[in-house]
Curated annotation (Swiss-Prot):
InterPro entries tied to this protein: RAI2/SOBP
Keywords: Metal-binding, Repeat, Zinc, Zinc-finger
Organism per entry: Danio rerio
Annotated GO MF terms: zinc ion binding
Name listed for the protein in its UniProt record: Sine oculis-binding protein homolog B
GO biological process, any: animal organ development
Amino acid sequence: MDACRPAEKRSRKPAHPLRRNISEDMKNFAENTMNELLGWYGYDKVDLQDSEAADARNRVKRNHISVLKENAVPKPLNVEKKIPPSSSSSSSSSSSCSSEPVRNGDQDPPTVPVSPSASSASPRHNMNVIVPLIKPSAVEDVQNVQIVCVWCQKEGMKRYSLLMGSELKSFCSEKCFAACRRAYFKRNKARDEDRHGDKSPSPGQTLDTPTRLMLKMNNNNSSTRVCDWCKHIRHTKEYLDFGSGEERLQFCSTKCLNQYKMDVFYREARAALTSSKEEENHPKPAATSENQTLLTPDAWESPAKSLSPQTPTASALQRTPVCMRVQMATSPKSPTGPSQGTPEQPRPPHMPLPFIRPPLHAQSLRSPTPNLPHNPPHPLSPTQRVPFAPPPHYPLPYLPLHPTFPPQMPPPWPQPMMMMPYPVFVPIPIPIPIPIPISPQNSHRGVIRSLQEPEKEPAGSQRVKTERCVSPVSASERQVIQCLRRDSVKEERNDTHIQTLRKALYTSVLTSTASASLDGRIVSPASLYSLARSTAIQAASFSLDSSSGQIPSPLSDCEDVKENSYLCGRGNDSANQWTAEQMDCQSDQSKEGKGEEETPQDVEHTYARSVPPKLREKNTHVNTQTHLHTQIWEKNTQVDELGPEQSVRDDAEPAVKRRCLRIRDQNK
């Protein structure tokens, strides 16, 4: 029949499980396996005596599959409320056992597992199945108990608890609970594998540790080792022993040992720093630290020595502030040396602490504490000294011989830098603008200057006094005016032409002597005065167009002067005036060639005509042309009989026309 069934139906499970009779061998094997698993996880051993007790315990285990389900052991008070009245006469043990199917909805009669007669006949049925479980979360929420976690040693709320015999271990989180259970499991499993006859308790246990935590197989006790740093079970036989006596520790590898040493070293360094700072403010006697026990690196090389921390005592003055004592000895305020106590004088906050330990690779895993200068019989080795510290062979009694060092001189030895970056100041040249004064004679002081500025002339020069006196303008200023004229052409006013005429006239007056001679004729101050007066009258009568904005050339300046001087001449003074104008123009051109020409200074002198550089290079040619123009004007202008005012009116238009023609030629 089975051969005719399809293949896919062979693996199908039956709808209802089949109850089979289990042999005694299988029961014993299940009991041993269950006890082994319970022992690995730190639970009590369960003994199954007969099949009925085995069935009852199996039902309890089915109801409590996992420890994390937080199901408590059935309580008689709660059970009696749910028991039917027909079974109220049964014992408490039978009611507790029979109440489980009722609570879970099973339809079996309550007296099926254990009958009242059977319970009275066998007293072992009265014992409840004790399985260590976690308390319900509702009870914990009501209590809100503050506990110290057994695993992480931190304070927190009680979340999980594990009952181990008479000891109840509490955990703050599921993570700690799982880690502790895993550690016990590995420890018990390793004990089972080792099977050596060492009955001494492991480092993580004490003598009063319950024996249920140790798995018993074939009546042989087996123990294992747990690393005191990583708290893990290693399947290695070569554990590293560290220390002796009660402080004997075991590590599974050199990595754990080194990490433990680093942790101890770090805690010792922090304790030393804290105690030294407290001692500076409030010194304490040395007897207060005798009762303290701290595992320090002192025991790394001397295991027989007592493990007591070396806290700062009264010899702290000899132990630290080497650089502090040097500064005390060198300062003029305290020349007495190190005989005075340091607690009275506050240490600067930036002072490096010389008792800070170097890293472990620099000291070869040795403690620098017992080899400091307070222990002279054992000098420091080169690898154990503090970096840049002075040698201990030169004690402090040598320092009072030289109590006062210069403040600028450094100490005889370099100060400890404590492996910190040392700033080195490197001078970097930074360009800084420095104002350089420039002499006003050789530089351009501005295009427009004030009229009140004093005039500076050579000491040997003399000047003919006129009605208006102006200050000279240097050659560089004339060049600036030349550039302004080339850039933009502005509309000239009538005063511009008046200024042009005055410029040529007044500069011609500035001669080296009061009277100049040319060709045997003398120019007197009277003739110059009359010439200036006639020029002013002629300038007042001019009316020029705005189109004549261009400034005439230096030749036109001389011609204007000649025209005005001829029109202003009277009688016999005309010849003297012509020769004076000729001489003035020549002297003006010569001074411009040398860069020493003096021009009038006025508000509108910007529009004055300056001599171009090409004409300056040809001083001889300019002087020749000026002389020829003077000869031509002497021949063409012979109107001495007319008055000065009439002559100005008659010749005003030809002069303007000639100027316009010159401007047009320059524009071409």
